[in-house]
């Protein structure tokens, strides 16, 4: 009996380390944990998740495979593999697992980490009604312009004529959120609203806690019972509860003042849709879905744009000659008696190229959002089993030496053609491509342009004498975020 048990255990152990036939090459699998020990060692060595993917690619090629805990993980680097994934329907899924369900009450809800009919219905609802509420319209632009003016006024007060250094790494958080929140909840927040400052700090912490592949909670879910603190479960639940409570309060306020004849925002429209679809068995419009949708938009809608703008200020500190050239262009094309508008975008070509180069060089979402294989398929000659989590290294795309020549160099001119126009590049994908392309791209582009141009139109950004020049090395996580830094803002007029 004992011998039989030992034989069975040995058989199961051997079975556990056998890779699927044709699976992409990668590090050795161990029983139970798969490649996890190698993954953690490599992460400790290189410091960032996206550099782990680059390390894998340099050893095994553009498509590499691991198993982390129970999860199959495939990482794609380089243009051909990434484009193939983003444009093929069989890779349009999102990972399913304990972590991905934890944030949405144990179910597959929201719009970011769903697929199939639920995702199609919710994405269609969001796009249709956000457009009606102003996405991509003059009213959206007016909202952002108002936020930019308020930010400038706040910075004038806080900077004391340029004498006082201001923390700049998170200065855009609330004004960026306000541009979205006006459409989502019909409300804007004061820039000094301490509750929002604290909540957005929690959002930043959540993004830094999360591993792009899903992390320990997804790969080894029992760890939440064995080591709740070490696995991140305790902190994550604390943060999520704070955000859930805020979103529920917002939705409850809408319910109390709901008027079916006066649709104020996306939450109202969702509540109306819930009423009209009550009798439909397969409708995805329910209470928890509304909270989950708000969670997705609240977190993803502010994080990447705010981080990009934080890095933009950092680049202007480190490259003062670029800052001066942007300001010269603003003075020449906009003048001093008005603020920049989106209509100025065509004439502010160097500024536009600077924003593109910031997005390329910083690559705020270096691993994108994870995809999932919806069926057994093949990628560049390798077998990808159904259910495999697929990560695309946008960092490898934006830092490819053969394509960019000098990818480590910050050089906005690479996006300007010989005749002075903006040069589009297929390798530049800050918002992705395909069906899973970022739904907030229009708002994000407008926000980046208007906040960045308005800031440099009104201030010169100088380093603080009290602290050394900051580094471009940011915090790791699902997104990269700038580490705390301050700058002096000198009024230009």
UniProtKB/Swiss-Prot annotation:
Q: What is its EC number?
A: 1.14.14.127
The residues that hold heme are 438
Keywords attached to this Swiss-Prot or TrEMBL record, sorted alphabetically, are: Glycoprotein, Heme, Iron, Metal-binding, Monooxygenase, Oxidoreductase, Signal
One family name in Pfam for this protein: p450
UniProt entry tagged with the keyword Oxidoreductase:
yes
Q: Which residues form a coiled coil?
A: none
| GO-annotated molecular function | heme binding; iron ion binding; methyl farnesoate epoxidase activity; oxidoreductase activity, acting on paired donors, with incorporation or reduction of molecular oxygen, NAD(P)H as one donor, and incorporation of one atom of oxygen; steroid hydroxylase activity
Which EC class, in a word? oxidoreductase
**What Gene Ontology terms describe where this protein resides (cellular component)?**
cytoplasm; intracellular membrane-bounded organelle
Q: In which tissues is it expressed?
A: Specifically expressed in the corpora allata of at the time of maximal juvenile hormone production by the glands.
Q: Does the keyword Glycoprotein apply?
A: yes
Q: What switches its activity on or off, per the activity regulation note?
A: Inhibited by substituted imidazole inhibitors TH27, KK96 and KK71.
Matching CDD domains: CYP15A1-like (cd20651)
Query: What InterPro entries does this protein map onto?
Result: Cyt_P450, Cyt_P450_CS, Cyt_P450_E_grp-I, Cyt_P450_sf, Cytochrome_P450_fam2
GO BP terms in the entry: juvenile hormone biosynthetic process; organic acid metabolic process; xenobiotic metabolic process
Positions bearing carbohydrate: 282, 458
Name the PANTHER family on file. CYTOCHROME P450 15A1, CYTOCHROME P450 508A4-RELATED
**Family (UniProt):** Belongs to the cytochrome P450 family.
| Protein name from the UniProt record | Methyl farnesoate epoxidase
């Amino acid at each position: 009996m004992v011998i039989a048990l030992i034989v069975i255990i040995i058989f199961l152990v051997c079975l556990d380390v056998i890779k699927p036939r044709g699976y992409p090459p990668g590090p050795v699998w161990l029983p139970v944990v798969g490649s996890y020990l190698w993954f953690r060692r490599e992460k400790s060595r290189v410091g960032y998740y996206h550099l782990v993917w680059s390390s894998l690619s340099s050893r095994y090629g553009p498509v590499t495979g691991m198993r982390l805990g129970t999860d199959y993980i495939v990482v794609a680097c380089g243009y051909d593999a990434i484009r193939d994934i983003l444009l093929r329907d069989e890779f349009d899924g999102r990972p399913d697992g304990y972590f991905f369900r934890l944030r949405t009450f144990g179910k597959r809800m929201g719009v970011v980490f769903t697929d199939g009919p639920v995702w199609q219905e919710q994405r269609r609802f969001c796009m249709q009604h956000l457009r009606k509420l102003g996405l991509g319209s003059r009213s959206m632009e007016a909202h952002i312009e108002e936020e930019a003016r308020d930010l400038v006024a706040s910075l004038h007060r806080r900077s004391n004529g340029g004498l006082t250094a201001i923390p700049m790494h998170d200065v855009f958080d609330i004004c960026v959120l306000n541009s979205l929140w006006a459409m989502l909840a019909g409300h804007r927040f004061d820039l000094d609203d301490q509750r929002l400052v604290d909540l957005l700090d929690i959002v930043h912490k959540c993004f830094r806690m999360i591993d792009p592949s899903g992390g320990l909670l997804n790969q080894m879910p029992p760890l939440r019972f064995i080591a709740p603190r070490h696995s991140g479960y305790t902190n994550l639940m604390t943060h999520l509860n704070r955000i859930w409570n805020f979103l529920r309060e917002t939705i409850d306020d809408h319910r109390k003042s709901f008027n079916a004849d006066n649709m104020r925002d996306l939450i109202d429209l969702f509540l109306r849709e819930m009423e009209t679809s009550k009798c439909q068995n397969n409708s995805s419009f329910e209470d928890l879905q509304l909270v989950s949708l708000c969670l997705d938009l609240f977190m993803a809608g502010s994080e990447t744009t705010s981080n990009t703008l934080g890095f933009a200020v950092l680049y202007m500190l480190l490259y003062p000659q670029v800052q001066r050239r942007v300001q010269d262009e603003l003075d020449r094309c906009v003048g001093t008696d008005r603020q920049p508008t989106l209509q100025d975008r065509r004439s502010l070509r160097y500024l536009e190229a600077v924003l593109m180069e910031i997005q390329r060089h910083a690559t705020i979402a270096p691993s994108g959002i994870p995809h999932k294989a919806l069926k057994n398929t093949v990628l560049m000659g390798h077998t990808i089993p159904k259910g495999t989590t697929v990560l695309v290294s946008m960092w490898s795309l934006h830092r490819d030496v053969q394509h960019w020549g000098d990818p480590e160099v910050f050089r906005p001119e690479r996006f300007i053609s010989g005749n002075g126009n903006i040069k589009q590049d297929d390798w530049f994908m800050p918002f992705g491509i395909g069906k899973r392309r970022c739904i907030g791209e229009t708002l994000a582009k407008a926000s980046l342009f208007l906040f960045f141009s308005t800031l440099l139109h009104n201030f010169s950004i100088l380093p603080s004498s009290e602290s050394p020049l900051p580094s471009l090395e940011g915090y790791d996580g699902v997104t990269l975020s700038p580490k705390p830094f301050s700058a002096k803002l000198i009024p230009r007029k």
